Amino acid sequence: MSVPKLRFKAFDGDWSETLFQDLFIFKNGVNASKEQYGSGIKFINVLDIINNPNGITYDSIIGSVNITSKEIDKNLVKYGDVLFQRSSETREEVGQSNVYLGKDPVVFGGFVIRGSAQKEYDPIFMNGLLKTDSLRDQITQLSGGSTRFNIGQDSLSKVSAYLPLKEEQTKIASFLSAADEKISQLTQKHELLSQYKQGMMQKLFSQQLRFKADDGSEFGEWEDKKLGEVGENIIGLTYSPTDVTNDGTGILVLRSSNIKEGRLDKSDQVRVNKKIQDKIIVQPNDILICTRNGSQRLIGKSVIINDDEVMTFGAFMSVYRSKYNRFIAYLMQTPWFFEQVQMNLGARINQITTGTLNEFTFDFPCLEEQTKIANFLSAIDQKIEVVAQQIEQAKQWKKGLLQQMFV
């Protein structure tokens, strides 16, 4: 029966199945020389499709291209047009789509397919429909390729979708817009808290803002110290492909991909069956640091470990171990830390050695003031984490609704 599991009470009757060939007119986008990019009319590329899940607005479009008025007319994108990603390295991502919600004229790039409406629909409803599992499954199954996966106009024409009347589409669209607004508000709150934290860190570590002792007295002067004087840098585990397990057994080896936005993320796992020295078993309050990577921007990113699982860390990582780590973990998020990282990167390889890390020099307050600073910043982090969880819950709630409000 072609009706959704969740439905507004004012509506009944079956949704009608419609082929994309009857819903859209498809066209591939602009192919221009590299000299033509960077000026002219705005054009939608693959990144615009991926980075704007709630719809592409005029202001969100990054690129521009200098083409003739004739080319503009042929490749114009209008309000409500759907844009599809033509190719991807993975089948799961091919054919990702988005709707243009801007009123100003734009064009679209050669790695994109435009679907111009042949029948009237609500663009926000259509954007939600295209992100449901059933539509995504149809599109990915129709893609082809081996090293790269592609979807063409003919394949997209074979996709079918169930649509209600326009009035019900608009009702669903309004509901989805309200959910998106809630997520947007939470995201803005998260950004403001993060900015507040950065501002307070700037003031605290520059000593522009100082705490006082519990008795109201002033703390003493901060002292220059090297990281090697107050703690120890430890080199990670070297292992071979034959040590890696594929059945979930063995010890987890932490790598750079396990540090995401200052948090430990264990979703990307490599586990090994190998005898591990006690020294390179991660301890509570250890700081995990990326010390070697093909991407220079990842060097120096770190996270403090507060996890009960027995874990080790890879050879491209380092662990810093100190009784002052609650303070030092925040110190390693400051511009002063990353300035020293950039100054000491290897000439040929993107790396900082443990010996180099030991020479990094910073101003340190007494332990009592360190504790007050760490407690203050930790309280902000807890608020940021609560909002991050609320954002994720709201996204999952919306995703669940998408699967039930569409056929």
Predicted regions and their residues:
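Non-catalytic DNA-recognition/assembly elements of restriction-modification systems
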Residues: 3-30, 158, 166, 213-237, ...
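Short amphipathic coiled-coil heptad-repeat segments
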Residues: 1-12, 178, 183-223, 386-407
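Extended amphipathic alpha-helical segments enriched in small hydrophobics
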Residues: 169-172, 179, 366-394
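A short glycine-rich beta-alpha junction/loop motif
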Residues: 2-4, 31, 105-111, 143-167, ...
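A short beta-sheet element
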Residues: 45-46, 62-131, 255-256, 275-335, ...
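Sequence-specific dsDNA recognition surfaces
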Residues: 21-33, 48-82, 228-242, 257-286, ...
